[in-house]
Amino acid sequence: MLSRVWLIALLTLVVAAAAGGAEGGFLRRSGTELLLDGKPLRLVAVNKFDLFLRYLKGGDERKQAQEALASAAAHGFTAIRFSGVGFYPVDMKNWPRQEAWWGAFDALVADAQQAGVRLIPVVNWNTSLFPDMAQECVLDMLGAPDSRSWQYLELYARQLVARYRDNETILFWELSNELNLGADLGPMRPYGYEGLNWVDLGTSYMRLRRDNYTSDDMIGYMARLAGAIRSVDSNHLIATGNSAPRPAAQHMRRQQGEMDWTPDSLDDLAAYMRDTNADPIDLISIHFYSEHDNMRFGNTDPLSAKALAQLKEAADRVGKPLYIGETGDNYEQRPDTPFLRDVLDTATRLKIPLTLVWQWDLPGDPNDVNPTRTPAAVEMMERANAAMGGG
């Protein structure tokens, strides 16, 4: 752990090095380009899922988050994606205590602004959070505006967005995390399934039949949530937080009672992207990992990122900017990170505006990226930022 004196000194250096990193107005979209201060955005930055949760806990937990924030900024990673809400119901216990909850969020935003770091809060990371709080199922939240779970979510989203709608430290809002990966799986689990069921943390005992949902259920829900956010905040752009569509996503969407894993064509991919990123959603989010998202369109090399070209082409057909909300490598098996290298090289060549690596300074996590544990990855990210003109 860093000493408090060292932390203050580092934050001072960061402000000098990142002069106005959180200045330049709000992020804007022009066709398939993202513009910040009138210039095309080109940036490699990071995820830190637990950033706000550590601020909320206080003490040493907050100190770790502050150190991670300062360290990211010092290395030129001037945007951080994180969960802007609790993960389990137990994490929400201080939500009714407005001073404790929003005081922690205000402190995070203030520290980020001082460090020159933009923030990408995910409004609802764990899809089951609000249904578990309401003792309902996911489909209630997605499809029933009068459900308790939707009312919980809408209230929280409106509180969060209204509080920071005029703050340029917020880069943009994300609605969820990988909601698309849970869609259209009903035929595989017709009676329910186990998923993040930690009853001691406030969850339901099991996921039930009504926790399944389709892409079309998701599309309606996303439109409703994005519309609620847009009605409060006209300054910030909105993204879904989705992963790259499954290689068979459009076929799965059209399935009739059984799974259809037929690989999608480029036309299918573009149609799925169009429908799942309809207005008022501004940006097309993908998460891109080895052996999950890259094995499509003829690619058989698990360490190749060439499928990014087809994903970018599909997004261009939709007419909205595509960014990589998560990517990374197996740092224990491949310390030289060949997949991440190809992702960064390909993103640079394709002029993808934003690439966010999973995940920054999470002690004990196998995906932890930091200068001590994964120096090759950090240096590679810094070089990519220099090549893009970001950082």
Regions flagged by a language model, labelled:
Residues 6-16:
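Bacterial N-terminal signal peptides
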Residues 20-81, 92-96, 110-114, 230, ...:
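N-terminal carbohydrate-binding accessory modules
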Residues 44, 78-79, 171, 282, ...:
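Short acidic/polar active-site loop segments enriched in Thr and Asp
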Residues 60-133, 138, 161, 212-239, ...:
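Aromatic-lined substrate-binding rim segments of carbohydrate-active enzymes
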Residues 127-162, 204-206:
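Active-site-adjacent "subsite" loops/lids of carbohydrate-active enzymes
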Residues 148, 153, 276, 334-391:
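Aromatic-rich peripheral "rim/lid" segments of glycoside hydrolase catalytic domains that contact
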Residues 155-158, 162, 169, 180-353, ...:
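Extracellular glycoside hydrolase catalytic/binding regions
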